[in-house]
Curated annotation (Swiss-Prot):
Source lineage: Eukaryota, Metazoa, Ecdysozoa, Arthropoda, Hexapoda
Disruption phenotype: RNAi-mediated knockdown specifically in pHCl-2 expressing enterocytes delays pupariation and reduces food intake.
TM regions (residue ranges): none
Protein name: V-type proton ATPase subunit C
Gene name in the database record: Vha44
Quaternary assembly: V-ATPase is a heteromultimeric enzyme made up of two complexes: the ATP-hydrolytic V1 complex and the proton translocation V0 complex. The V1 complex consists of three catalytic AB heterodimers that form a heterohexamer, three peripheral stalks each consisting of EG heterodimers, one central rotor including subunits D and F, and the regulatory subunits C and H. The proton translocation complex V0 consists of the proton transport subunit a, a ring of proteolipid subunits c9c'', rotary subunit d, subunits e and f, and the accessory subunits VhaAC45 and ATP6AP2.
A cellular component annotation (GO) from this entry: plasma membrane proton-transporting V-type ATPase complex
UniProt tissue specificity: In larvae, expressed in the ring gland, CNS, imaginal disks and lymph gland.
Coiled coil: none
An individual GO BP term: proton transmembrane transport
Family: Belongs to the V-ATPase C subunit family.
GO MF: proton-transporting ATPase activity, rotational mechanism
Organism: Drosophila melanogaster (Fruit fly)
Compositionally biased region (Low complexity): 302-316, 425-450, 512-529
Residue stretches of biased makeup (Pro residues): 160-169
Length: 836
């Protein structure tokens, strides 16, 4: 496509719609030569034909003037933006430059975490090694990561339970969750290695047991989780996704095979008293520590689960992580919230309490995620749905996966609820079946402690199914999904009268009406193309991408240019408007250019050669003899190749020079700056003889007040330039839009006047906007000449001699550009020059 549009008008046949359909079928649908749009021109006041003849010539001049001012505004806008583009680019590069490479830390953020962890290590190692030396002795040989990030629970038990005897049966759980999840590891395995390869991985398991948490620093779990996320981030997408499914299944299986007890802390509550592996209720063997390791904190650009992160957050008094924050670091999305694996159950209560009060409502936390809310309310909802005859097979149920996903995002972002993407019908059917089975079992079996544990485990599987389904999308898909989600949030919250963030200024668009035009016919009302009906008139073109949209959906601005006025008055309104823009542009551009010129001169003086640059930043007070009645100090510029000559002979240039008073102050590629002290009465003689020897004396007087004033002047100029830059750019954008809109209205006036002059009264013509294909311009001309050649027999054959190439009054172009139909060009390549 081209940046050039054509506006033509043809006399109406029986109806103007028929004229448009005939032309559109022949040029666009059959031969695909162009894209056609209806160009709406209202029913303007015609006046007399004599008035139209004179107005036609004036409109041609006005068209040229308006286009000139529009391009002038666009070009100056490009200059102003180009002036700041290099500095902005340098600032962005300086802010986004990567830090030094490191093997274990991929970015500066994690490098800082590493240093913080090392400081915690030195402090923690001293106290922890004295109190519990057995914790450190096991991992003393590891040096690749901070010691406080390694698993320290291979031989540690919870303080609430005695240590397991050495002759414990093999089916009993080990002392720590790390050993449960990775029995093959000598130091406590890790779930962080999600790939299927057997390459050695750094061992930095974080144990959530009470002993380790009591000794570890507050930020250990959070730091370890960050490092774990970085390790996971280096894996491929396919292995990450498959391993995530396996890991979630493993955690779900561990939780399913154990009951839930009421522990003294979050980790104890999340601990499935691992001694209950036989499926018992609340009290079995000795309950060791939590079987849910913090290695389940996956970073796959999806909502993740981590019991250790929540445990560390609940134990830490620093509150460094916010439970309700969606943090995005290094393009990796990590949800750090209260909705972890250990919190996906109902509110924990003792089994005896449930047995004695089976219908008591669970306690609801003040702030819960949608998953927690749906699970805490599911028991009552299931019974109510059964009594009312409702089923859970509806895919739009609030307990479905789609609703949970949508509510979860609503809860994280605190935005109005929106529909999320639909999952497959198979997932909906399986979810509905699972919920229906839960409802049936709820009413068929009394709520015993064993049934309650099974019911909670089913909800744990359901919640993990939600997280598992939310984690099966690759990283790139989540990035694009959240970008589109942000666009939806902005589009729902923004209105036409609000601030336009992309363009940086607030512009309230003028509402335009769409009058029924006798020249376009009643069937063309509100149509911008033969296939679509716009919901509302186009706004002002606030960006380059909106110029074609404004042009193809053009409608007359009834507020600025009322159609009750005569054509001459409308032309005068446009002329005054553009004249005002031109005058303001001259004033604003002159003020800004003067400010920029003064600032550039000062910058050149700071960065130029020693012959021209300002010496105030180079000299110091100790370089001068001040407040002396007889002595003075001069600054001399010496060519670099003659520096030795100066040091040898400067005392002999004239009399009364202080011996050995010269010293080198500054040098560049070509010159050296020296000072010399002498008597005031021989200063002029010294300058004369120094010039003869090609030594240049700079006129400089050291005055601290003047030097400070010079520095303040440059700071003031920079501040003034920054203050003027923003309003100037906004003014240029607004007035560029105003000038472009005025230009299109002038084109519409010219089409109307020329159509009346050619086709006569009553007004009956159809104006059409054509967007020609770049390779089909010549063929399009031939088709239009065949279609409308009968309107002018002289040019129907397309042969015009050069002798007849003369200007036609009122048209503004030669006969070589004359066609049997009304034709005007609209070129929008001014935007390319503006580089907005």
């Amino acid at each position: 496509m081209m940046s050039e549009y054509w506006i033509i008008s043809a006399p109406g046949d029986k109806t103007c719609q028929q004229t448009y359909d005939t032309m559109n079928n022949l040029t666009s649908k059959q031969h695909n030569l162009c894209n056609n749009y209806k160009f709406h021109i209202p029913d303007l006041k015609v006046g007399t034909l004599d008035q139209l003849v004179g107005l036609s010539d004036d409109l041609g001049k006005l068209d040229t003037y308006v286009e000139q001012i529009t391009r002038k505004v666009a070009n100056y806008l490009g200059e102003v933006l180009e002036d700041q583009r290099d500095k902005l680019h340098e600032n962005l590069m300086a802010n986004n430059s990567p830090g030094p490479p490191d093997d274990s830390m991929p970015c500066r953020h994690h490098q800082r975490i590493k240093h913080l962890s090392l400081r915690h290590q030195r402090k923690h190692q001293h106290t922890h090694h004295q109190n519990k030396p057995q914790h450190y002795h096991h991992h003393h040989h590891h040096h690749q990561l901070p010691q406080d990030l390694k698993g320290k629970s291979a031989a540690t038990c919870s303080p609430a339970t005695p240590p397991a005897p050495a002759s414990a049966p093999p089916h009993l759980p080990p002392a720590c969750a790390c050993d449960v999840l990775a029995p093959g590891s000598l130091t406590g395995g890790s779930l962080t290695n999600l790939s299927t390869s057997h390459e050695p991985e750094p061992e930095f398991d974080v144990c959530p047991c009470d002993e380790c948490f009591a000794c570890a620093p507050p930020s250990t779990s959070a730091t370890a989780s960050t490092l774990l996320a970085d390790e996971c981030y280096s894996q491929t997408a396919s292995s990450m996704l498959s391993a995530t499914r396996c890991a979630l299944s493993t955690v779900a299986a561990i939780a399913t095979g154990s009951g839930l007890g009421n522990g003294p802390s979050t980790s104890a509550a999340a601990a499935a008293a691992a001694s209950n592996s036989s499926g018992g209720g609340g009290g079995g063997g000795p309950a060791s520590c939590s079987t849910l390791c913090s290695s389940a904190y996956f970073s796959t650009s999806a909502p993740t689960t981590s019991s250790s992160v929540h445990s560390s957050m609940s134990r830490s008094n620093s509150k460094r992580l916010n439970n309700n924050t969606c943090s995005i670091n290094n393009n990796k999305l990590s949800f750090r919230s209260g909705s972890h694996v250990s919190q996906l159950h109902l509110a924990t209560q003792q089994p005896q309490h449930h047995h004695s009060h089976p219908h008591q409502q669970p306690h609801t936390n003040p702030l819960q995620s949608p998953v927690q809310k749906s699970m805490s309310e599911d028991e009552g909802d299931a019974s109510n749905a059964h009594e009312d005859g409702e089923t859970d097979e509806d895919p739009k149920s609030p307990h479905s996966v789609q609703s949970d996903l949508s509510d979860a995002f609503d809860w994280w972002f605190n935005k109005p609820k929106r529909n999320s993407k639909k999952s497959s019908a198979q997932q909906q059917h399986e979810t509905a079946q699972l919920q229906h089975q839960q409802t049936t079992q709820q009413h068929a079996t009394p709520l015993t402690p064993q049934n309650h544990n099974q019911y909670q485990n089913q909800h744990l599987s359901k919640a993990m199914t939600f997280w598992h389904q939310a984690s099966t999308t690759p990283r790139s898909s989540y990035r694009s999904f959240f970008n589109s989600l942000a666009d939806q949030i902005y589009s729902k919250r923004s209105t036409p009268s609000q601030l336009n963030i992309n363009n940086g200024f607030n512009l309230t668009p003028t509402h335009r009406s769409s009058p029924v035009s006798s020249c376009c016919g009643s069937s063309s009302q509100g149509r911008s193309s033969p296939d679509t009906d716009p919901a509302e008139p186009p706004e002002f073109p606030l960006s380059p991408a909106e110029l074609p949209q404004y042009l193809t959906r053009f409608q007359w601005d009834m507020a600025k240019y009322p159609i009750k006025q005569s054509l001459r008055n409308i032309a005068d309104i446009i002329s005054k408007q553009i004249g005002q823009i031109d005058g303001d542009l001259k004033t604003k551009s002159q003020a800004y250019n003067n400010l920029k010129g003064n600032l550039q001169n000062l910058e050149k003086k700071k960065t130029g050669s020693l012959l021209t640059r300002n010496l105030a930043d180079l000299v110091k007070k100790e370089h001068f003899i001040l407040d002396s009645e007889y002595l003075t100090t001069l600054l001399v510029i010496v060519p670099k190749v003659m520096a030795n000559d100066w040091l040898t002979n400067y005392e002999k240039i004239t009399d009364m020079i202080v011996p050995r008073s010269s010293q080198l102050i500054q040098e560049d590629a070509d010159y050296c700056l020296f000072n010399v002290t002498l008597f005031k009465k021989v200063a002029e003689e010294f300058k004369l003889h120094a010039r003869e020897r090609k030594f240049i004396v700079r006129d400089f007087v050291y005055n601290e007040e003047e030097l400070a004033a010079g520095k303040n002047e440059m700071t003031k100029l920079m501040t003034d330039k920054k203050k003027q830059f923003g309003p100037l750019v906004r003014w240029l954008k607004v007035n560029f839009s105003e000038a472009f809109c005025a230009l299109i209205h002038v084109k519409a006036l010219r089409v109307f006047v020329e159509s009346v002059l050619r086709y006569g009264l009553p007004v009956n013509f159809q104006a059409i906007l054509i967007e020609p294909n770049k390779k089909s311009v010549k063929r399009l001309r031939d088709v239009l000449n065949q279609l409308y050649g009968h309107l002018d027999g002289a040019s129907a054959g397309g042969a015009v001699s050069s002798a007849d190439n003369v200007d036609i009054p009122g048209l503004g172009f030669g006969q070589s550009e004359y066609f049997p139909y009304v034709f005007y060009k609209v070129n929008i390549d001014m935007v390319e020059q503006a580089k907005v």
